[in-house]
């Protein structure tokens, strides 16, 4: 017996400039992820109880003895690959390789300022502090394996801001974008772990890729090639990212398909929030 195929659909502009900005997980394009409902897996129920004796009907195709088709992009490779699939719809694969991008030439035309960069660093510090505090203090099991991953940035940012202060620069207070993102993370952390995990993934993995490329350009233009602590990690970054990916996959294994889809759909919000902070670099 046939069933409907589940497909992911993402819509976004095709402009080269927008591709560059979204590559660093900053420009908030509208991304809509839809999965067609099926008899066996409706939008809000992964499986249905067939009767009172708790028999599970998982898939009509399987019930008919046929091999079920794969329904979600990258699902066999783990949930992190599903998240990457959604992000890659916004910035192509060939632009996300160790912080390098064909967009380098475009970024080189941006006019960075110390004042704008400090605002960016201050708000980024607030977001990372919030993210790390939630993970360290929460009793939610899904966050337990995300402590002390080596990706933490708040302490590094504190050292960077202290360096700027020693150079005679005035450090600004946190601005509205940083405060808004911080508060949103606090609001969803306890009641919506899948959504929070989406932000954790996008914040850390975007900074490890596009964020490093931006940091290099800023250093070249206005910091006399000074490499900030924000862009340094203890150990091999690739190994740190791999360890976190494995942990996120373990967390997602306990989720229903509904919860996984909800996590993927949160990607748009993470882009919107971080874009507001990134705009300081362009002002």
UniProtKB/Swiss-Prot annotation:
GO terms for molecular function: heme binding; heme oxygenase (decyclizing) activity; metal ion binding; mRNA binding. Its EC number is 1.14.14.18. GO terms for cellular component: chloroplast. One of its GO terms (biological process) is heme oxidation. Optimum pH is 7.2. It comes from the Eukaryota. Heme b binds at residue 91. InterPro entries: Haem_Oase, Haem_Oase-like, Haem_Oase-like_multi-hlx, Haem_Oase_decyc_pln. Widely expressed at low levels. It holds the Pfam family Heme_oxygenase. It catalyses: heme b + 3 reduced [NADPH--hemoprotein reductase] + 3 O2 = biliverdin IXalpha + CO + Fe(2+) + 3 oxidized [NADPH--hemoprotein reductase] + 3 H2O + H(+). It is found in: Plastid, Chloroplast. It is an enzyme of class 1 (oxidoreductase). Keywords: Chloroplast, Heme, Iron, Metal-binding, Oxidoreductase, Photosynthesis, Plastid, Transit peptide. Disruption phenotype: No visible phenotype under normal growth conditions. Belongs to the heme oxygenase family. Catalyzes the opening of the heme ring to form the open-chain tetrapyrrole biliverdin IX with the release of iron and carbon monoxide (CO). Produces specifically the biliverdin IX-alpha isomer. Plays a minor role in phytochrome assembly and photomorphogenesis. This is Heme oxygenase 4, chloroplastic. It comes from Arabidopsis thaliana (Mouse-ear cress).
């Amino acid at each position: 017996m046939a069933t409907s195929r589940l497909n992911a659909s993402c819509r976004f502009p095709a402009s080269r400039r927008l591709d560059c900005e979204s590559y660093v997980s900053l420009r908030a394009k509208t991304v809509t992820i839809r999965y067609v409902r099926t008899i066996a897996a409706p939008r809000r129920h992964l499986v249905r109880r067939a009767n009172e004796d708790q028999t599970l009907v998982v898939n009509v195709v399987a019930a008919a003895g046929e091999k079920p088709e794969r329904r979600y992009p990258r699902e066999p490779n783990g949930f992190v690959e599903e998240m990457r699939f959604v992000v890659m719809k916004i910035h192509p694969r060939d632009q996300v390789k160790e912080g390098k991008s064909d967009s380098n030439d475009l970024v080189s035309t941006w006019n960075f300022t110390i004042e704008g960069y400090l605002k960016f660093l201050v708000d980024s510090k607030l977001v990372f502090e919030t993210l790390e505090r939630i993970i360290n203090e929460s009793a939610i099991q899904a966050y337990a394996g995300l402590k002390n991953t080596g990706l933490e940035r708040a302490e590094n940012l504190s050292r960077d801001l202290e360096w700027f202060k020693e150079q005679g620069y005035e450090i600004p207070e946190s601005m509205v974008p940083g405060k808004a993102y911080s508060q949103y993370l606090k609001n969803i952390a306890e009641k919506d772990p899948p959504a929070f995990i989406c932000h954790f993934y996008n914040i850390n993995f975007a900074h490890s890729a596009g964020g490093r490329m931006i940091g290099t350009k800023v250093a070249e233009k206005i910091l006399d090639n000074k490499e900030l602590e924000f862009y340094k990690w203890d150990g091999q970054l690739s190994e740190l990212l791999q360890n976190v990916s494995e942990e996120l996959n373990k967390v997602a294994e306990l989720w229903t398909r509904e919860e996984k889809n909800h996590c993927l759909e949160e990607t748009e919000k993470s882009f919107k929030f971080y874009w507001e902070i990134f705009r300081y670099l362009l002002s």
